[in-house]
């Protein structure tokens, strides 16, 4: 038993005027006053801890709720019918037919990854995997979305190698393939990198599990790793003498992950589900046991009583506040009927997973009682803990937005040598260069069900070995576009992820997101956020695919300067037969090349604008989601295409270069019909475009015309190892080997000798 002296509910009643460090825990004056009003007294130390954790921006979404409701308002009945579990659950779950369901979610672990890159990123993977486990699913793959400062920034040199190592270590040890992602470099992320992790899992429809505690007398069981002192510095639980006896205890603010413990926990959970001994389940992530138990209680039909004396600990003399707020990894919390407790414990013992009965569901509706050292340290309504405050913060379009949207001058090469130099500069730029330095550290094919991953438009996975049914997943974002016009920027991210999935032949069925923004106390940031949410919600409605869930990460800034607003959008698609999915590697035999979609002189927020040294300005490309739907109608179920590659950053030039490099093929292309300007044809970033390879051109042209998809014949592939380009009045050749050398060397040269990589911020 702990020797820590508790601040009990009885003490709180006797000492109403005791000063408490609520500000150090992130609570505002009015929030502290509201807690006292709810309880009818001052909170105990443990209650103050729980409310501060659960009312944090991370757990409560207090600044974003008013805007996130728009997702629900724009979801039609038809869209909702596809979702088995949606916004508010640990992850979205989609019914894909034949009794199968897929669950997926993306979440941020930004600030921990800056402080301690390896563990921050590793536990980001661990946390999102447990979200998927908590839905009753087997995790089958991960993806990542990474943002760093400039390539030569010392912080980037320190953080990136550690982040990549953390992701690869944890994911590889779990045996989960990393099937895709995106890495972006921009000055705005210096000092505040973004580490967003996505996980996808599969389950049978009838095996779906939800996070709620119901059934009076049912037991609450904590299982997994023991609870320690790691991961609680971030919520400032021990920021004052009121919460700590002595200063010798040094607490890591970043959680420490054990992927092998999580691997065992996955198998243990799946056997528990199969045995039918789980009523409700919740993973322990941000907010730890405080979050898991109070959320279970709030979602249930009764109350809950928790005894912290039964929690397996790995540190001595832990206070109630420490036990509740600890974010030790690899832990789950389940609700189990009394008759199934013995079987539950047997299964945990089989897998050598530590477990303990720590509480029970009571018949006292909306009452959450926590006991430590035999004393009551929390007695509060769980609904008030879980719901948190709701803020409608000021929203104001930034004063400089009009000026930002004015189109500035950019260099526009005309002669052959300048165009070739521009092309090589683009493919070698940090924005577009090969990510093999990163992705080769990930195992993409473990488990044997990865169909597409390396250099693919979208990750493609087989989920049913008998039918070859599978899914395609892509996640995309553009902070540059979103900075210029947040509504359009979010829709462009949605359009690109949708198009990536479509280009494999998959039918898009659902959306997830992770919205990374600056401080919500900045009215300009809140305007960006609101506009992005509306753009994403309206776009999803137009495409007819529901937003199944998401995550919000605020306070991403260095000093007063926020990051580029970065709404990461993930799209899930379904393939009836993954063996018929369309890849993006040109076949060895020669094929005709076609460009689908129109090209306009659109360079606002483009990579050429960035690489050429022009400031970020102008308007992003126009997005017409009906054009994306037309492309979907052309691709889904079609056997016309030998290969496909969507166009996005870097435009047609980047796509042609990657196609040639990956297949070691040459090509003759005539761009005179694409746009009068060869420069625009190559480097503009207009949306709704895909390059395809086919030898059934007449059929393609006919079908595209029927659907209203603009189609332009570019030329044909060959074995020359040269891209021969023809414009309206310009012709030139560029060597594939020259492009390859430019494309492949940038990241290895930058990080081959990264000094201080993965150093911890003190």
Curated annotation (Swiss-Prot):
Pathway this chain belongs to: Purine metabolism; IMP biosynthesis via de novo pathway; 5-amino-1-(5-phospho-D-ribosyl)imidazole from N(2)-formyl-N(1)-(5-phospho-D-ribosyl)glycinamide: step 1/2
Top-rank taxon, per record: Bacteria
Binding site for Mg(2+) 1: 107, 551
Substrates-to-products reaction catalysed: N(2)-formyl-N(1)-(5-phospho-beta-D-ribosyl)glycinamide + L-glutamine + ATP + H2O = 2-formamido-N(1)-(5-O-phospho-beta-D-ribosyl)acetamidine + L-glutamate + ADP + phosphate + H(+)
Single GO BP term: 'de novo' IMP biosynthetic process
Keywords: ATP-binding, Cytoplasm, Ligase, Magnesium, Metal-binding, Nucleotide-binding, Purine biosynthesis
Protein name as annotated: Phosphoribosylformylglycinamidine synthase subunit PurL
Organism listed in the record: Corynebacterium glutamicum (strain R)
Gene name, Swiss-Prot/TrEMBL: purL
